[in-house]
Amino acid sequence: MNFVIATRRSKLAQVQTEIIIDLLNKKHDIECEKLLIETVGDKILEVSLDKIGGKGLFVKDIEVAMLEQRADAAVHSMKDVPYEMPKGFEIIAIPEREDVRDAFISLDNIKFKDLRKGAKIGTSSRRRAAQLKLLRPDLDIVPIRGNVQTRIEKIKKENLDGIILAVAGLKRVNLDHLITDYFDTKEMVPAIGQGALGIEVMEEHPKKELFKDLDHYNSKICVLAERAFMRELDGDCHSTIGAYASIKDNIMHIIGIFERKNKIIKKEITGTKDQYEKLGISLAEHILKD
């Protein structure tokens, strides 16, 4: 059996797809090949994502490939997937999640707490920028885009004191040795679905059940809880929004942030994990009442 898996062209996206292909090979006797696609979000690098507009900038072109039957499935970073799935598509599986934290990479291995006043920090994320300002109001936030390697190179090219990147991506491309500091999830709440990969298929695909074996239940319901929070607030990856759900002894804890009326609101909620979607919605409702 031969499967075509669509993904973005970046090194990170290809590595993530190879992770899924390896998992598939361990479970089933399946030959897989990658279909590399340049998405709208990959093509327009000189403009910040929130100014390009729209949701699903990194997934729509890939969904077209599945619609045209050029691909059987797609692998995405779940933080790039809008909460509203197009008709006929579904996330069939979310494998075990990687480290959800954000990392700080500095020019000369200077710790975040030791940064000079007015230090220049690169990030294209409104979520990260807002939380950095809460931690250090003096920081100068510089928007940067590009793949992981490109952003790391911009530290020297653009005379930055450091940048913020997801730990998961750095680990997957073997660049985590460059990390200067790790942010705790309470001081830098991650993006919705950060560290998680999702396998997208068309609902009518005859072989879609093969991917279900790759599903990691606790990882999946944590991501679904975060996405319920995002849906209730009508957020996306361009909003100042973040959430992280974790499970211990069947109890789910969610921390979430959202910018409302020019104020960053942070709330937490705890409950049984079988109520994961209700917990995400309730957390959003608490924020809207603030």
From Swiss-Prot:
Cofactor note: Binds 1 dipyrromethane group covalently.
Needed cofactors: dipyrromethane
Gene3D superfamilies, per the entry: Periplasmic binding protein-like II, Porphobilinogen deaminase, C-terminal domain
GO biological process: protoporphyrinogen IX biosynthetic process
InterPro entries: HemC, Porphobilin_deaminase_N, Porphobilinogen_deaminase_C, Porphobilinogen_deaminase_C_sf
Pathway field: Porphyrin-containing compound metabolism; protoporphyrin-IX biosynthesis; coproporphyrinogen-III from 5-aminolevulinate: step 2/4
Gene Ontology CC terms: cytoplasm
Keyword annotations: Porphyrin biosynthesis, Transferase
Modified residues (S-(dipyrrolylmethanemethyl)cysteine): 237
Any one GO molecular-function label of the UniProt entry: hydroxymethylbilane synthase activity
Assigned EC number: 2.5.1.61
Catalysis: reaction(s): 4 porphobilinogen + H2O = hydroxymethylbilane + 4 NH4(+)
Subunit note: Monomer.
Miscellaneous note of the record: The porphobilinogen subunits are added to the dipyrromethane group.
Matching HAMAP family: Porphobil_deam
Family: Belongs to the HMBS family.
Listed name of the protein: Porphobilinogen deaminase
Source species of the chain: Clostridium botulinum (strain Kyoto / Type A2)
